[in-house]
Amino acid sequence: MAFQLTPLRVALVAGEPSGDLLGASLLGGLHARLPASSRYYGIGGPRMSAVEFDAHWPMEKLAVRGYVEALKHIPEILRIRGELKRQLLAEPPDAFVGIDAPDFNFGLEQALRGAGIPTIHFVCPSIWAWRGGRIKKIVKAVDHMLCLFPFEPELLEKAGVAATFVGHPLADEIPLAPDTHGARIALGLPGGGPVIAVLPGSRRSEIELIGPTFFDAMELMQQREPGVRFVVPAATPALRALLQPLVDAHPSLSVTLTEGRAQVAMTAADAILVKSGTVTLEAALLKKPMVISYKVPWLTGQIMRRQGYLPYVGLPNILAGRFVVPELLQHFATPDALADATLTQLRDDANRRALTDIFTDMHLALRQNTAQRAAEAVARVIDSRKPR
């Protein structure tokens, strides 16, 4: 496949931090693969902007989680999508890449595809876990799906959607053997007792719902395991300010509150208490025992429960096809239960060794040079639509 030297235009939309990570990885591959001076623009975050991406809107405008919570933001989100659609139809890009955010991207992709613009979607929605009816939207909206997990292309191809397994960029980024000692030195935690990383979420609403419960669990853990130390990474300065009162309300805790540096915090840990999400995959790639938890508003939880197919929500369990780490969700996420489960993960050396083997196999399966594979797939789609 050979492109002429004419620069291309690729529009991309990412709606949350995990999409920003994927988008930055893809952009790195596209810069290497497509002609120089090609233009990349749309909606993205700071990681994408750092690799020559022109963000017309910040992704924070789209980063709303949950059914009930999203209602008040719908008018602005629809306005942004409508304006972006008009721009892209008026000046069609050579390809559009929607990165996750299916509720935003599928409607946009369907309109663009109908106008003859090639559409690629990066991250297959978890149709194998819940809301399987979305496959009908995928068929209408997507020319090609870039899949993070190896079992997804077969499911899509049965429905008539072209797909490529590209692996996960975190598996490329994270070393197979994490440097726990080096991470502790970086955080100022070189000696002393065991370390537990606590990650209550990357959104204000998540921290407000589960943060107090996590900190109460930390208090119980310190009572039951004297000498234990905690590190709590905050994704942004605003979230650090939100977490600080929880730290102040528990003065007896030995806790280090950081800004950013979530991967360093998890690398430094002996065990992790984590709110469900992509970060659980990161914890698995770091070979760490963990407890996965979440709390969402009651109505959101009821909707999610009724539309789910699998008995687990954490990516490590989904990829393993069984429970390999505990999940404590909704009303089961009490301080006592979280403390007990996390300390069990901390203390069980046989379980730690077994998890290391399981997570190493996952790591190797997902380590595929994602940036290059994804960029090659995008290039093939663009090339297939060029006049011969």
UniProtKB/Swiss-Prot annotation:
InterPro entries, per the entry: Glyco_trans_19
Keyword Lipid biosynthesis part of the UniProt annotation: yes
Catalysed transformations (reactions): a lipid X + a UDP-2-N,3-O-bis[(3R)-3-hydroxyacyl]-alpha-D-glucosamine = a lipid A disaccharide + UDP + H(+)
EC identifiers of the protein: 2.4.1.182
Recorded metabolic or biological pathway in which this protein acts: Bacterial outer membrane biogenesis; LPS lipid A biosynthesis
A Pfam family of this chain: LpxB
Entry GO MF terms: lipid-A-disaccharide synthase activity; phospholipid binding
Protein name: Lipid-A-disaccharide synthase
Family per record: Belongs to the LpxB family.
Organism: Burkholderia pseudomallei (strain 668)
GO biological processes: lipid A biosynthetic process
Keyword Cell division: no
Highest taxon in the source lineage: Bacteria
Top-level class of the enzyme under EC nomenclature: transferase
Residue ranges of the TM segments: none
HAMAP family: LpxB
Protein's job: Condensation of UDP-2,3-diacylglucosamine and 2,3-diacylglucosamine-1-phosphate to form lipid A disaccharide, a precursor of lipid A, a phosphorylated glycolipid that anchors the lipopolysaccharide to the outer membrane of the cell.
Swiss-Prot/TrEMBL keywords: Glycosyltransferase, Lipid A biosynthesis, Lipid biosynthesis, Lipid metabolism, Transferase
Gene Ontology cellular component annotations, sorted alphabetically: membrane
Gene3D superfamilies documented for this protein: Glycogen Phosphorylase B
